[in-house]
Each structure stands twice: as C-alpha cells, then as structure tokens.
C-alpha cells in the first residue's frame, strides 16, 4: 500500500480511502445528488453540504493574514476569539452541490474581474432566469465537491454577496479567491 502523511495527503488524492468515505452527517437529508459518479466526470472524493465562513473579503479569503472569518488556512480560532459581539453569528452555512448545466445552484462561474468587482458576478446571471448563468458562461461544479478540501470554493463561503447569490471566481483553479456565496 501507499504511505501517507499524518492527516492524509492532498484532498484531491482519490486513492486515499478516507477521502472517498462518505460521512452521512456531512450531507443534508434533502440532497439527492449522486455522491460518486465516475461516468459523469464527478470526483470520487466524498461530498458535503456544509461550509465554513471565510469572512467578507474576496481577495486573500484563504490567507490567514487577510481572512476576517472564523476559518482560515493554518489558523485556529475559538469562540473566545470572537470579541465584536456579532462575529460568531456567521460560522457555518449550507452549500448546494452542483446541479449541472448553467444553473447557479452549486456552480461557480468563471468571470474575469470578479476578484475586484463583485457586480460582475451578478451580471453573469441570465436576465430571464436569475437562477441560471447566461449561455456561454464557463462553469465549475466545486461547491461541496470534496469534504476534505479547505479551499473556499469547495467547503467555504464568504459574505461578499448575500446567501443564495451566485458563486464566481476569476480563474479556473479551485484554489483561487472568489465570491463563494452560501446557497
């Protein structure tokens, strides 16, 4: 067998059995999307419907120096670290996993410039269907895709836009900063 470091390898390593093990508590009971679907190109890594707050910033949302949420890369916080009276109200949120197609639900639109202008994310919605992106929009189904991945695109959200707003990234790399709304 393969040797792995303590706490496991990178979260995209599908040959690591614990990453493929679905934890039922990580899925909302109403989520009927397939868990592992090799035929449709979905990752064999287990999924989640729950995400963690990375604060209210687009740029550097995963960088502990810039993060204003409770969860940041290589950082540990406790409830006692919340001192402004309201910071512990947004700790976790629900994530819709990709529904496929151009639907806004669970999909992240790749829109150049969204790292500095969040209005571009909303502008990518179809004016005739506010629950879908306009035809031709490049889409990634990252939301909730790998429960073991700390990237905001997979298991996090920020409060740049209100809940149930679109999710957008400036780049096709799933580790890029972006507007990752809870949905």
Segments and roles (model prediction):
Residues 1-183:
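Internal low-complexity, small-residue/proline-rich segments
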């Amino acid at each position: 067998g393969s040797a792995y470091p303590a706490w496991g390898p990178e979260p995209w390593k599908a040959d690591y059995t614990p990453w493929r093990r679905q934890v039922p508590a990580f899925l909302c009971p109403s989520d009927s999307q397939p868990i592992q679907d090799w035929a449709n190109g979905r990752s064999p890594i287990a999924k989640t419907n729950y995400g963690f707050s990375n604060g209210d910033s687009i740029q550097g949302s995963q960088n502990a120096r810039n993060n204003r949420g409770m969860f940041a890369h290589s950082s540990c916080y406790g409830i006692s670290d919340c001192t402004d009276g309201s910071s512990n109200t947004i700790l976790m949120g629900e994530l819709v996993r990709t529904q496929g197609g151009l639907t806004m639900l669970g999909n992240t639109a790749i829109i150049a410039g969204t790292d500095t202008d969040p209005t571009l994310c909303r502008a990518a919605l179809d004016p005739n269907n506010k629950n879908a992106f306009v035809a031709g929009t490049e889409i990634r189904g990252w939301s909730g895709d790998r429960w073991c991945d700390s990237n905001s695109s997979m298991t996090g959200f920020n409060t740049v836009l209100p809940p149930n707003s679109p999710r957008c990234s400036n780049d096709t790399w799933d580790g890029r900063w972006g507007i990752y709304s809870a949905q």
